[in-house]
Amino acid sequence: RRWISDNNRWNSPRYILGESYGGIRGPLLVSELRSGDLTPIEINGLLMVAPASDYQYLVFHPGNNSPHYGFLPSYAATAYYHNKVDTNKSLQEFYNDSKDFSLNEYGPALLKGSRIKDNDKKILIDKYSKFTGLSKRFVEDFDMRIDPSSFRKELLRDEGYSVGRLD
C-alpha cells in the first residue's frame, strides 16, 4: 500500500503471479489484498504457472494413495524416455495406457489396502513393472507405493545413474 501511494500507482493494473505452490498462495494473497483491514487493493488478474492446487496429490504420506496413482503416468513417460519399457507404442499411446491403468486398476486397488487378493496384487505388480521399468521385486518390496526419490534412484541403477528431478 505504501509503495503504491508513494509512487502514485493506484490507477495502475496489478497482477499476482503464482508458480507451483503459489497456486495455493496466490488466491489467498488476492483475497487478503482485496479484503484487508486497511485500504483494499484491487487485483486485475491472477496468473498461475504450473500450479500445485491440491497438496493431497503431492505429499507421499502413509495412508495417502493419491500421489501414487497420480505420479505413475509420469514414471511411465520417464521410463519410456530412458528405454526401460518394452513397447512398440508411441509415447502418447503408452502414456495414455498408463493413465488408464493408474485410474481404473492401480488407484482402486490401492484403496483396498491389505484386502486385495494375492493373485490380483501379482497382476498389478506385473503391470506396474511393465509401465515403469522397475523390477517386480522392487515394486513388491515397496508395496506398489513408490515415491519419486526412490523411483529416480532405481530406474537407472543398473547403469550406475539416477534420474534427475526434472527429467
Model regions and ranges:
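Glycine-rich nucleophile elbow surrounding the catalytic serine of serine-hydrolase chemistry
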Residues: G18-S31
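A catalytic-pocket lid/entrance helix-loop region that shapes and gates access to the active site
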Residues: V30, R34-G133
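Short alpha-helical interface elements
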Residues: I24-R25, Y57, F71, K153
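Alpha/beta-hydrolase active-site loop
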Residues: R1-S5
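Alpha/beta-hydrolase fold catalytic core
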Residues: A109-D167
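Alpha/beta-hydrolase fold nucleophile elbow
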Residues: N8-Y21
